[in-house]
């Protein structure tokens, strides 16, 4: 028999290599997968396996089942039989010889310890008894000597003072009695201590003996509990309870009539009682054809005194009913606990993991959070990455305020004209470019500066190594400049400041330094860490110094990445191309991305069918810090998602589908959560006007930025609702959705196709195209302003002073007035002021001048005024006439 490798032997035996290695280890032979196995080693392994096969089982389980019948009296004198089945199961574990020897040694040591403790206790008791006897003898001698001296003294003083002698004797007797009592108590305490010591030693020995007997290998099953006496015992308990109840009732009746004390109940199993007599009489009646029985049963279950704390396993989402089942409580208790925490839910509602954890911990249970992404972790861990890290190019993000010259600066570096291609001259999505310089390669990310693109700038700061903060020398620090500083600090990346537009006459770079120093950006000449470079994107001055500063900062950072192996990176931007499908701009962080790789990207997956660089040229691979556009994904990924190359497309699809389902569950759980503080907002929701919008844009980042900006415009009276959003042109489905929801169709750098235009014309939908985000936001603001209810404002048009008061049978009190300001008009609302305090507000009913009804009276003229439903007009009052005007409100 020739030697074979362990792998070949495993294949021959049809077992795994790891299993065979373990079997060799159990047989005392250490082998690895590539080692050879000799014939002698095979014989050793075979003998070991045979020994394991013939050895008896390690466990022996005995099961016993007993059945009995219990008769229970029912209503109407009828009884019913209940079948009772008692199942018992006992498992005996076989001990190995070493374990048996160890237990025997422990038992022997326990017996020796017990014997030693008993001997020590006896010796201690003897010593204490001897010491006690000696103390008692000494005390007895002292007492006898004292008594003798007292007797002699008493005989001498007996004649002189009999009364004093009696008192002395009494005191001495009392003292002797107390001493005797103290000695007796001490003796009892010593005996009690000795008795406790012996009992403790005996208890320890008994416990050790019992444990040794339980651990022995024995096939004797435990005795089956005899249930034949069950009915007798139950009936006896019931009779005792009934007798006790009768005694309490009779004792309560007899308290007010000097009743005799109740006699104690008879002890013993066969004690006669009222229940026994009634049961005997019932048996006699039953023999004569009666159907009643006097026996009764009593339930012996007692409610647990304290709550049971359980380990509750909670997944990422769980319903209220499932959570209640895991805690073994009713669903109403869980709902009550959630209401105490401020959340309302139904029993079938899905809640998120954090809420379920709070509820379970509030109810006193221990929470175990279960991770449901084992498959995802397995796919991510099964990646082949190289070990050696090599230097890589820095990723530089250009940030700053809008119109401060970021894209123009990058244009000069790339010697291209990208800014002219941007709508309105402003950047509206991230551009990724890499340029070759004399000192090395640099990858640039150009971010938008408009306020709406906050999330884009945050993404750019997270994916970058160095931030170039562009500040216009004539404009200074602006809001988006401050925001860019905050993003850079949050991402923990160094900042290089490029002071742009230095060629302008009004440029003031020192002011820029002073303003930036207030936000923690200090130049190196002031003792800070940030490099300041004066540049001009138009003239090209300072560009070389800026590139040198970037490369110097990158050299300080010592940027390295693994160049070989499976790639990983981040999505910078994504969009839907009509001819190519979903397109994602990916920045590779480590590894090398090849054409044909299987990538997992957020909720999407796919095989890389094509790769293009920023110039639109086809490339076959992309290393670290290289931005590329990839085609072949199953859908448009979200900007900011992680891109990972995996081995298996099937597993990638499973992970993507799992992520989609998990995202949907968590989203539903958060949507359904309705807290108490939002209850009144939900009640008044029907009174709020809504502007429904269906949004389509060219890239994912623009959709995200526009959605955030529009949702921030919502007020308490008018809310913006994004009914649907997506990347790509406006389709027939989008138009149908807008028609069904009465929404406005908004296209940002996209157009509607022919089928969508037909639906838009037939349904008369409002379709708007935009290429600049400013115009879109302004028009939505105008539409929302039209839905606002107008503001009502009171404007005083006249003031009259009461000079005299007349009585009219038709109108009551008529005020004779002089108009002091403005004009008094009929049927306008008025206020009556007395000492500049409003005492009545109503309507002007009658206005006359020289007994003629007039519509208005001008300043400086007299008139008679009748106030509707008011007669308490006095001389000196002022009558103020006003009108209510409406002012159209706008959204700021």
Curated annotation (Swiss-Prot):
Any one GO CC term of the record: cytoplasm
Domain of life: Bacteria
Residue intervals of the tr-type G domain: 391-560
An annotated Gene Ontology molecular function: guanosine tetraphosphate binding
Compartments reported by the entry: Cytoplasm
Primary subcellular site in the record, as a coarse category: cytoplasm
Residue numbers spanned by region G1: 400-407
Region (G4): 500-503
Protein name (database record): Translation initiation factor IF-2
Naturally occurring in which organism (per UniProt): Salmonella typhimurium (strain LT2 / SGSC1412 / ATCC 700720)
């Amino acid at each position: 028999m020739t030697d074979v490798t362990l792998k070949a032997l495993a294949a021959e035996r049809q077992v795994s290599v790891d299993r065979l290695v373990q079997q060799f280890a159990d047989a005392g032979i250490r082998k690895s997968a590539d080692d050879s196995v000799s014939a002698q080693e095979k014989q050793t392994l075979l003998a070991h396996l045979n020994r394991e096969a013939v050895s008896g089982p390690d466990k022996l389980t005995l099961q016993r089942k007993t059945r009995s019948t219990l008769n229970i009296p029912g209503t109407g004198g009828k009884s019913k039989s209940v079948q009772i089945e008692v199942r018992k199961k006992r498992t005996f574990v076989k001990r190995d010889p070493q374990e048996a020897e160890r237990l025997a040694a422990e038992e022997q040591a326990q017996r020796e310890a017990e014997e030693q403790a008993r001997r020590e206790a006896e010796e201690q008791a003897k010593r204490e008894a001897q010491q006690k006897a000696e103390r008692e003898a000494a005390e007895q001698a002292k007492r006898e000597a004292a008594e003798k001296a007292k007797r002699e003294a008493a005989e001498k003083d007996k004649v002189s003072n009999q009364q004093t002698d009696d008192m002395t004797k009494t005191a001495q007797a009392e003292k002797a009695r107390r001493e005797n009592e103290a000695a007796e108590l001490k003796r009892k305490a010593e005996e009690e201590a000795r008795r406790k010591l012996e009992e403790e030693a005996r208890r320890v020995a008994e416990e050790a003996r019992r444990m040794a007997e339980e651990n022995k290998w024995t096939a004797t099953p435990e005795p089956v509990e005899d249930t034949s006496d069950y009915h007798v015992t139950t009936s006896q308990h019931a009779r005792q309870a009934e007798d006790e109840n009768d005694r309490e009732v009779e004792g309560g009746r007899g308290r007010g009539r000097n009743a005799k004390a109740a006699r104690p109940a008879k002890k013993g199993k066969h004690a006669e009682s009222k229940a026994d007599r009634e049961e005997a009489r019932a048996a006699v009646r039953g023999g004569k054809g009666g159907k009643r029985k006097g026996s009764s049963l009593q339930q012996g279950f007692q409610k647990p005194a304290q709550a049971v704390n359980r380990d509750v396993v909670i997944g990422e989402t769980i319903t209220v009913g499932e959570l209640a089942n895991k805690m073994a409580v009713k669903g109403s208790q869980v709902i009550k606990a959630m209401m105490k925490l401020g959340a309302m839910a139904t029993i079938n509602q899905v809640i998120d993991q954090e809420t379920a954890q709070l509820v379970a911990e509030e109810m006193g249970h221990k929470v175990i959070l279960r991770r449901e992404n084992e498959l995802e972790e397995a796919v991510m861990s099964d990646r082949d990455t190289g070990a050696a890290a090599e230097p890589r190019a820095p990723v530089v993000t250009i940030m700053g305020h809008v119109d401060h010259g970021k894209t123009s600066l990058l244009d000069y570096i790339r010697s291209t004209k990208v800014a002219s291609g941007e709508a309105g001259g402003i950047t509206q999505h991230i551009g990724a470019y890499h340029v070759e310089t004399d000192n090395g390669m640099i990858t640039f990310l150009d971010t938008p500066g408009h306020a709406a693109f906050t999330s884009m700038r945050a993404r750019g700061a997270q994916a970058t190594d160095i931030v170039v903060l562009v500040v216009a020398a004539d404009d200074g620090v602006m809001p988006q400049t401050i925001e860019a500083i905050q993003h850079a600090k949050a991402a923990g990346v160094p900042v290089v400041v490029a002071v742009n537009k230095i060629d302008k006459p009004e440029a003031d770079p020192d002011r820029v330094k002073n303003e930036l120093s207030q936000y923690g950006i200090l130049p190196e000449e002031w003792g800070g860490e940030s490099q300041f470079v004066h540049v001009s994107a138009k003239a090209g001055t300072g560009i070389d110094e800026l590139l040198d500063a970037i490369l110097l900062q990158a050299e300080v950072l010592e940027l390295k990445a693994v160049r070989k192996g499976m790639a990983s990176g981040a999505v910078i931007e994504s969009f839907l191309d009509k001819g190519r499908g979903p397109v994602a701009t990916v920045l590779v962080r480590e590894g090398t991305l090849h054409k044909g790789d299987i990538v997992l990207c957020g909720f999407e997956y796919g095989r890389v069918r094509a790769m293009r660089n920023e110039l639109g040229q086809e490339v076959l691979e992309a290393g670290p810090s290289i931005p590329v556009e990839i085609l072949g994904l199953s859908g448009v990924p979200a900007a900011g998602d992680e891109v990972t190359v995996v081995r298996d497309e099937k597993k990638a699809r499973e992970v993507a589908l799992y992520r989609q389902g998990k995202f949907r569950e968590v989203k539903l759980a958060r949507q359904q959560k309705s807290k108490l503080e939002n209850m009144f907002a939900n009640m008044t929701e029907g009174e709020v006007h809504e502007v429904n919008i269906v949004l389509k844009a060219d890239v994912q980042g623009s959709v995200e930025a526009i959605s955030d900006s529009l949702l921030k415009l919502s007020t308490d009276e008018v809310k913006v609702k994004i009914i649907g959003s997506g990347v790509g042109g406006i389709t027939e489905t989008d138009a149908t959705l807008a028609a069904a929801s009465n929404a406005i169709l908004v296209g940002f750098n996209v157009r509607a196709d022919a089928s969508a235009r037909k639906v838009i014309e037939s349904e008369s939908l409002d379709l708007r195209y935009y290429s600049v985000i400013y115009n879109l936001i302004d028009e939505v603001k105008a539409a929302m302003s039209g839905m606002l209810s107008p503001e009502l404002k009171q404007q005083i048009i006249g003031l009259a002073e009461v000079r005299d008061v007349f009585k009219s049978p038709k109108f009551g009190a008529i005020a004779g007035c002089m108009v002091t300001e403005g004009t008094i008009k009929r049927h306008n609302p008025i206020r009556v002021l007395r000492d500049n305090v409003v005492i009545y507000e109503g309507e002007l009913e009658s206005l006359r001048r020289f007994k003629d009804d007039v519509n208005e009276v001008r300043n400086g003229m007299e008139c008679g005024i009748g106030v509707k439903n008011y007669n308490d007009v006095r001389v000196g009052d002022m009558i103020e006439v006003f009108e209510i005007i409406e002012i159209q409100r706008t959204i700021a």
